[in-house]
Amino acid sequence: MTEQALLLVNLGSPASTEVADVRRYLNQFLMDPYVVDLPWPLRRLLVSMILIKRPEQSAHAYASIWWPEGSPLVVLSRRLQEAVKPHWTKGPVELAMRYGEPSIEGALKRLAGQGITQVALAPLYPQFADSTTTTVIQEARRVIREHGLDLKLSILQPFYDQPEYLDALVASAMPHLQQGFDHLLLSFHGLPERHLHKSDPTGAHCLKGDDCCQRAEGAVLATCYRAQCIRTAEGFATRAGLRRDQWSVSFQSRLGRAKWIEPYTETRLDELAEQGVKKLLVMCPAFVSDCIETLEEIGDRGREQFIEAGGQELVLVPCLNTHEDWVQALVQLCSRAPQAL
């Protein structure tokens, strides 16, 4: 029987909190044309400007959440890899990061060197976006093509509405929901609006009306990040038995001056405090592993902002990380990954 390896891929992290390492990581991340979708000269100019001050600022943020073992995202991803191994009986389980180490190139070369010819590629992003899902797939294909590797890929599809994923979200969040709260904010990573327009296959649906995400279906839904985030939130809330007035959706991590998808998390934190919310739960379902965007942006800065605006307590619900239900769900989802053309 032919072995099939499983390659789990997450976003990545600097090698350390040193400014030089953070600058190197940010340069690789921001120079990805799927992330900053500008022509190369403009992208290089913009990234060079960002790299003047941002590495020092980001290094401080990383240092505030860094663990003795290293980057929380990388550590938690490795723990997930180890948790999955006993359940993936088809072959070895590798871990890679799209940016930084361990790299996709290194992982695929190791698998090819072991005589593996079939790989289930698992971008660990529940919702589709070119800046996450597509760039992982294209990087894997680049490595295979440029190094002449005899590898055939099966690719985990976005799983934003899959019952296994939603049930795992509910199971992981339920202990916090049961402790009582005034409101639940489901904060997803944001994207520039132009990314949604570019991924709309019709060129005439995304952001055309307040209910465009509710009306999205078929090919439009398959590539609309915002619509998929809303479907995740609705599926979670239904399974968790929440009333519609108990939760809302927002989008975080806005960068630069371009318009990003709304509502913004930083705006919602102030609004909810002003509306009298005292105990706020925040979940970040676009991330399966806790990282700087959850631990520092929400858990530290977001909490401080909410309390300064009049709230009393912000509870960050941990990501799925290595929750048993998530491990089982991930294995089931990857087992169904279709072979790429």
Swiss-Prot record:
Keywords: Cytoplasm, Heme biosynthesis, Iron, Lyase, Metal-binding, Porphyrin biosynthesis
Biological process (GO), any one: heme biosynthetic process
InterPro entries: Ferrochelatase, Ferrochelatase_C, Ferrochelatase_N
Gene symbol of the encoding locus: hemH
Record EC number: 4.98.1.1
Annotated function: Catalyzes the ferrous insertion into protoporphyrin IX.
Subcellular location: Cytoplasm
Pathway assigned to this chain's UniProt record: Porphyrin-containing compound metabolism; protoheme biosynthesis; protoheme from protoporphyrin-IX: step 1/1
Domain of life: Bacteria
Protein known as: Ferrochelatase
Gene Ontology MF terms in the entry: ferrochelatase activity; metal ion binding
